[in-house]
Amino acid sequence: MGEIIDGKKLAKEIQEKVTREVAELVKEGKKPGLAVVLVGDNQASRTYVRNKQKRTEEAGMKSVLIELPENVTEEKLLSVVEELNEDKTIHGILVQLPLPEHISEEKVIDTISYDKDVDGFHPVNVGNLFIGKDSFVPCTPAGIIELIKSTGTQIEGKRAVVIGRSNIVGKPVAQLLLNENATVTIAHSRTKDLPQVAKEADILVVATGLAKFVKKDYIKPGAVVIDVGMDRDENNKLCGDVDFDDVVEEAGFITPVPGGVGPMTITMLLANTLKAAKRIWKMN
């Protein structure tokens, strides 16, 4: 029976550490600031942004929310981002995705100053990640690495398989595992003999967006299984990309959904914002 990795507990520990560090900085008259830009009225995005704000304030940081209507022009959004780039009280900028179709996400991400790109999506940060240089790492992949390490697993020398090749999770988490000296395979919808490929993994990260896609026959006994999915099953119950009940018997460690990867994402955003503030103050 696999041990369940408690993402809530780990996220709380990291957040407490960030909060303590912020409190020390505030004593010196320095307060990290995070600005979130929300375009339109997507309810899921709104809920997510509210959570980010609440957690930012709990950590003792300045939290700014800028709301823009669905029909805002691309030009207006870019000018808002440019103003935030110049704002000395803001150290992290996050534009909540997805954006309306008439706005280029690429252009918006490219406009965010890479020193304030706490989502880790700017091409400079992506490039730095790939050459192994210190950078802002996308929050979910950063959280995944912390979850793996929390099990006591030595990543170096392990076989890691990542199912999913998105720019937000699959590719960056594969690169982080490579930077930790794992031997990494990226698998996807066109991979032949996927269960065989997955079964070689000491560390399996699943980010397919398909409910309960990974079954027990994908799992090497004792593997660390990280489930990035947020899906609904046939009974409309929240589940992941891994069939938890089927896989938990084979796995050594496994993240649940909910309560696994999810809580780590906002926590790593706070860690990135603190890091951004410290870097900006050091440069100045």
From Swiss-Prot:
EC assignment: 1.5.1.5, 3.5.4.9
Keywords, in A-Z order: Amino-acid biosynthesis, Histidine biosynthesis, Hydrolase, Methionine biosynthesis, Multifunctional enzyme, NADP, One-carbon metabolism, Oxidoreductase, Purine biosynthesis
> Which CDD domains does its entry note?
NAD_bind_m-THF_DH_Cyclohyd
Q: In which pathway does it act?
A: One-carbon metabolism; tetrahydrofolate interconversion
Reactions accelerated catalytically: (6R)-5,10-methylene-5,6,7,8-tetrahydrofolate + NADP(+) = (6R)-5,10-methenyltetrahydrofolate + NADPH; (6R)-5,10-methenyltetrahydrofolate + H2O = (6R)-10-formyltetrahydrofolate + H(+)
Record flagged with keyword Amino-acid biosynthesis: yes
SUPFAM superfamilies xref list: Aminoacid dehydrogenase-like, N-terminal domain, NAD(P)-binding Rossmann-fold domains
TM ranges are none
Record keywords: Transmembrane included? no
The record's section on InterPro entries has:
Aminoacid_DH-like_N_sf, NAD(P)-bd_dom_sf, THF_DH/CycHdrlase, THF_DH/CycHdrlase_cat_dom, THF_DH/CycHdrlase_CS, THF_DH/CycHdrlase_NAD-bd_dom
Q: Which positions are annotated as binding NADP(+)?
A: 164-166, 189
Q: Which Pfam families does this UniProt record tie to the protein? A: THF_DHG_CYH, THF_DHG_CYH_C
What does the similarity note say?
Belongs to the tetrahydrofolate dehydrogenase/cyclohydrolase family.
The protein's assembly and partners: Homodimer.
Name of this protein: Bifunctional protein FolD
| Species | Listeria monocytogenes serotype 4b (strain CLIP80459)
Gene coding for it: folD
